[in-house]
């Protein structure tokens, strides 16, 4: 009868939670209206410039004027937009696969990971209490975000590592990606111009003055970043050939050249083509906050015969003091018979220090006397005796050498040239235009941090730093001005699969540690504290000093001699020889008697046993080095990312004011930065009159027959257009701030004003809208159209107004249907996107093709948006790796629901409300709340 195959054990899905860490309680977007005035008011943080007399400095245009005053940075509040717990999403899928177990209780427990506040009242007492730690993904200018973290949330001196990957040059589109669907971005392609206000402001402000602006941009951010670093902290700045010399000089100025650690060169996946010589490498400049106290965890690679670090390992120990020189074939690694543990190099046993009174001037070894020459031996007479008895000495000519085995320290420290970090076609899939290889960031973080440490990345991109930090148990904060980048990063983290490494503070970790150390497992209580690290693979680090100081060698030697010496004397008597130990041959001669052969075999057996015992003692007494990139893994478990929040800067424009509430003109800024709001409005109206407002289809374009100023508080212009019946319609034009976000409250006030003035429709023009404004489509009879302005308009004074190009585009509202499935359960279906038809004044629905992803909070409490279900409609599948790992736990049918316009069924919530958030490929977000 055929044996029935045992079912594979199901994998446990777990996550790491940093219970010992905390973060300040900050407001969610929902709580903005109940914040105290002092929490809402802008804070300015001043950073002192470095004393220019301390060392040589790079000079660029405008720097002297900037140095006349401190660097002053606004520190606006941050708002939580979403709370994401990837394990909740996987648990929900597992329940779907098991068909129908209740999800409410466990989800409630998991979302408690975001709380940790002392009382219910503390929810609205912002910046006063500590909550449980959750990682953070923040949309906004890194300069202001870092200042806010330092000043408002007391993170000054708390960050262990910063990985900064600024734009390598000063070209706009080559550094920014316009859509989640394409990495193909070309300068000069109008279709590929990013429309994100945060990015274009950064570009316009930063690169207006070429390399001079670039250096100002870097110095400002490095100054604020330094303030966040712990005394033991490090910063890594990744940069290309074009500006590496300038960036190094700026970092010398900000951090002090005494805190420079290394300039690392690493090979890129592809070269930069030029007419001269191709560039195949980029650079990482590494500085410490304070070199005397910076944290360093050495990185190693295994030694390979014949390569750098092993060229002297050309000898092979055959045992019993016999050795041979390796052949070229053996050195190349082609010989399978070579035991690399017995390969050794002959190292110097002497030092250049002149001999002093008690130093050994001569040492007898195997019947010959050896002197250290003009120097001295590296150890004393007792140490030399231990080396001799340990089989660690070898004469070469008139010199006595130290036998250093490859296995004594089988790794070599990684230097500052990395040729093993390139992304290959079979490794990570690249999703973002300037995505850095994961192995580069991984190595940097592992050298400068421990599990539980905080890592910050001011240029998030596709979220590689966050992904690496999450994998290795580090806490993380990542910042980007690009909505597209954060959309990609969020999907990447939500669907990521990580190995489950054995925690040192766990029962399994204690057992593994005991195996490695040869001791009995500890009985101490365990708490799964990440800060205590993982259990790592380790390698011995046997040194000359440790062998020289090993007194146990004498004990083993003397004990073995009780057997060896009588056998040696007996062998000499049988063969009529006077052999000393080192003279006894390894092989027998044909003319020996049977008794002599037996004695010879017994002696060599005891001799080899003595050496094994001494080798074991040497290994046991030696230090070891952890391989921090090789923790032990529990294959029965799979890990998903821990809880994280998606946040953004204050939705209000932040202006710096003095004590008299007058606007402050920031030093070093040009006149165009301080132009009146009226100038900005006039530029927008001029372009609006020429370009009109475009929707998804050309036939839906609103073309103005006239556009005249209007003296309102919020409405600034009266626009006229005609519908299909040639009836003239009046549109009130509301223009949002040049750098800021329009909120729902802004639209409500503007719509009321439009109704009072008898307009037919309100057209709001803004660079960005908050997610809550998405519900505001109509106020009474007034239809509200939200047009997103093209980022080109930030630079409108430099652009020719041709009326061509979609400068004002409406992202239609998602059309959502709530389906009652019976038994107290409901489903949500995204039907498409609603588009306003100006020719008819009606709304038409298009399909969901423009939607990248959509999320549901199935029990919305009007305090926070929890992502309880997530769906990804694009071609990229963020759950690809998890699907492979969890085949047995979650069936294909359940996985398929993640790429769907219809949600999985869920219980009607006790709160009576659900919230649906929809994100398009440009990173725009809209959120709708429904009563169910």
What positions do the PLM features span?
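S-adenosyl-L-methionine-dependent nucleic acid methyltransferase catalytic domains
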Residues: 1-295, 305-310, 316, 365, ...
């Amino acid at each position: 009868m055929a044996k029935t195959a045992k079912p594979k054990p199901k994998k446990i899905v777990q996550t790491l939670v940093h219970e010992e860490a905390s973060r300040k309680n900050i407001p969610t977007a929902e709580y903005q209206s109940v914040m105290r005035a002092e929490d809402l008011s802008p804070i300015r943080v001043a950073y002192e410039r470095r004393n220019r007399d301390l060392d040589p400095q790079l000079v660029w245009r405008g720097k002297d004027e900037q140095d006349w005053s401190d660097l002053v940075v606004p520190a606006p509040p941050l708002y939580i937009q979403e709370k994401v717990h990837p394990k909740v999403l996987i648990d929900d899928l597992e329940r779907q696969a098991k068909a129908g177990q209740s999800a409410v209780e466990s989800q409630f427990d998991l979302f408690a990971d975001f709380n940790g506040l002392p009382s219910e009242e503390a929810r609205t007492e912002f910046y006063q209490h500590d909550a449980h730690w959750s990682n953070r993904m923040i949309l906004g200018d890194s300069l202001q975000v870092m200042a806010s973290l330092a000043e408002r949330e007391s993170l000054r001196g708390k960050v262990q590592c910063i990985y900064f990957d600024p734009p390598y040059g000063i070209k706009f589109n080559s550094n920014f990606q316009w859509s989640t669907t394409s990495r193909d971005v070309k300068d000069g392609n109008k279709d590929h111009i990013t429309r994100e206000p945060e990015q274009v402001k950064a570009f316009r402000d930063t690169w207006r003055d070429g390399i001079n602006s670039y250096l100002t941009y870097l110095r400002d951010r490095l100054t604020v970043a330094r303030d966040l670093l712990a005394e033991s902290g490090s910063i890594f700045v990744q940069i290309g050939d074009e500006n590496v010399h300038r960036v190094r000089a700026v970092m010398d100025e900000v951090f002090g050249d005494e805190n420079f650690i290394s300039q690392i060169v690493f090979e890129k996946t592809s070269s930069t083509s030029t007419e001269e010589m191709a560039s195949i490498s980029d650079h990482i400049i590494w500085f410490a906050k304070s070199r005397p106290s910076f944290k360093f965890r050495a990185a190693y690679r295994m030694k390979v015969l014949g390569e750098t670090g092993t060229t002297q390992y050309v000898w092979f120990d055959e045992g019993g003091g016999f050795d041979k020189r390796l052949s070229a074939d053996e050195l190349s690694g082609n010989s399978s018979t070579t035991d690399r543990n017995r390969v050794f190099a002959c190292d110097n046993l002497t030092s250049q220090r002149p001999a002093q009174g008690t130093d050994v001037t001569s040492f007898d070894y195997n019947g010959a006397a050896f002197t250290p020459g003009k120097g001295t031996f590296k150890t004393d007479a007792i140490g030399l005796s231990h080396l001799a008895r340990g089989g660690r000495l070898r004469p070469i000519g008139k010199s006595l050498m130290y036998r250093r085995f490859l296995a004594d320290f089988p790794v070599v420290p990684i230097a500052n040239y990395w040729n093993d970090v390139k992304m290959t076609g079979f490794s990570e899939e690249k999703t973002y235009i300037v995505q850095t290889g994961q192995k580069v960031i991984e190595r940097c973080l592992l050298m400068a941090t421990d599990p539980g440490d905080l890592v910050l990345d001011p240029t998030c991109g596709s979220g590689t730093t966050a992904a690496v930090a999450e994998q290795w148990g580090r806490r993380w904060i990542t910042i980007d001005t690009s909505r597209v980048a954060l959309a990609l990063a969020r999907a990447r983290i939500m669907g990521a699969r990580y190995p489950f490494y054995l925690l040192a503070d766990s029962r399994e970790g204690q057992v593994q540690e005991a195996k490695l150390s040869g001791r009995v497992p500890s009985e101490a209580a365990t708490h799964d504290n990440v800060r205590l690290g993982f259990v790592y693979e380790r390698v011995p680090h046997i040194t000359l000093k440790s062998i020289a100081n090993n007194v146990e060698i004498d004990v083993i030697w003397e004990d073995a001699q009780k057997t060896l010496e009588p056998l040696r004397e007996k062998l000499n008597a049988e063969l009529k020889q006077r052999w000393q130990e080192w003279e006894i041959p390894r092989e027998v001669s044909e003319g020996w008697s049977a008794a002599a052969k037996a004695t010879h075999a017994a002696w060599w057996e005891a001799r080899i046993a003595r050496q094994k015992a001494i080798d074991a003692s040497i290994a046991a007494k030696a230090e070891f080095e952890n391989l921090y990139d090789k923790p032990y893994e529990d294959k029965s478990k799979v890990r998903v990312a821990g809880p994280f929040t998606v946040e953004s800067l204050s939705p209000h424009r932040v202006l710096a004011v003095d004590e008299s509430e007058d606007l402050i003109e920031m030093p070093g800024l040009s006149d165009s930065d301080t132009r009146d709001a009226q100038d900005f409005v006039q530029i927008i109206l001029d372009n609006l009159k020429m370009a009109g407002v475009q929707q998804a289809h050309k036939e839906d374009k609103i073309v103005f027959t006239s556009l005249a100023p209007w003296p309102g508080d919020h409405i600034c212009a009266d626009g006229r257009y005609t519908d299909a019946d040639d009836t003239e319609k009046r549109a009130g034009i509301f223009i949002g701030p040049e750098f800021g976000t329009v909120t729902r409250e802004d639209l409500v006030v503007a719509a009321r004003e439009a109704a009072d003035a008898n307009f037919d429709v309100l057209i709001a023009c803004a660079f960005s809208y908050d997610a809550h404004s998405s519900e505001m489509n109509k106020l009474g009879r007034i239809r509200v159209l939200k047009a997103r302005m093209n980022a080109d308009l930030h630079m409108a004074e430099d652009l020719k107004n041709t009326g061509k190009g979609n400068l004002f585009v409406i992202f239609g509202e998602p059309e959502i249907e709530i389906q009652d499935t019976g038994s107290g359960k409901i489903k949500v279906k995204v039907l498409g996107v609603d588009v306003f038809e100006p020719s008819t004044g009606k709304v038409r629905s298009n399909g969901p093709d423009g939607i990248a992803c959509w999320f549901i909070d199935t029990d919305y409490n009007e305090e926070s948006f929890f992502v309880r279900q997530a769906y990804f409609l694009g071609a990229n599948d963020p759950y690809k790796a998890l699907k492979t790992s969890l085949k047995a736990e979650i069936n294909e049918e359940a996985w398929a629901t993640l790429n769907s316009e219809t949600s999985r069924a869920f219980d009607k919530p006790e709160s009576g409300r659900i919230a649906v958030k929809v994100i398009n490929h440009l990173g725009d977000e809209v959120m709708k709340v429904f009563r169910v």
